[in-house]
Amino acid sequence: MAGRSGSTDEELLRAVKAIKILYQSNPYPPPEGTRQARRNRRRRWRARQRQISAISERILTAYLGRPAEPVPLQLPPLERLHLDCSEDSGTSGTQQPQGTETGVGRS
C-alpha cells in the first residue's frame, strides 16, 4: 500500500482479518426442516448479516477515519445538461448512413 508506513499496514490487515472472521462466523443456514423453519433461519441470518455489516463499517471508519463509501461524484450544473430528442437520431446513440434500414426481415 503505497504511501503508508508499515505499522499502519499491519493495523489495516488486522482490521480486515477481524472483519473476515465476523463474516465467516455467520454461514448461510442449511436447507433443512420445514418451509417456516427455513424462512425463520434465513430471516435471522439476514439480521445477523446486517449487524456484521454495521460492525464492519464501524471498524473501518475507526481505522480510516472516514466512511468506507466512495466520495459522491461531482456532476455538472443542470443548466449545462440537455437531452437530444430529435426524431432522426438513433436509439442507441449510433448514427447510421442515410437511406439504410435496420430490422429483421427487411431487404
From Swiss-Prot:
Region described as Homomultimerization: spans on this chain: 18-26
Protein name as catalogued: Protein Rev
GO biological process: mRNA transport; viral process
Record GO cellular component, one term: host cell cytoplasm
Function, as annotated: Escorts unspliced or incompletely spliced viral pre-mRNAs (late transcripts) out of the nucleus of infected cells. These pre-mRNAs carry a recognition sequence called Rev responsive element (RRE) located in the env gene, that is not present in fully spliced viral mRNAs (early transcripts). This function is essential since most viral proteins are translated from unspliced or partially spliced pre-mRNAs which cannot exit the nucleus by the pathway used by fully processed cellular mRNAs. Rev itself is translated from a fully spliced mRNA that readily exits the nucleus.
Disordered as annotated region, ranges: 24-48, 82-107
Keyword Transport part of the UniProt annotation: yes
Domain notes: The RNA-binding motif binds to the RRE, a 240 bp stem-and-loop structure present in incompletely spliced viral pre-mRNAs. This region also contains the NLS which mediates nuclear localization via KPNB1 binding and, when the N-terminal sequence is present, nucleolar targeting. These overlapping functions prevent Rev bound to RRE from undesirable return to the nucleus. When Rev binds the RRE, the NLS becomes masked while the NES remains accessible. The leucine-rich NES mediates binding to human XPO1.
Biased composition (Basic residues): 36-48
Recorded GO MF terms: DNA-binding transcription factor activity; RNA binding
Modification note: Asymmetrically arginine dimethylated at one site by host PRMT6. Methylation impairs the RNA-binding activity and export of viral RNA from the nucleus to the cytoplasm.
Protein family: Belongs to the HIV-1 REV protein family.
Residue(s) carrying Phosphoserine: S5, S92
Keyword Chaperone attached: no
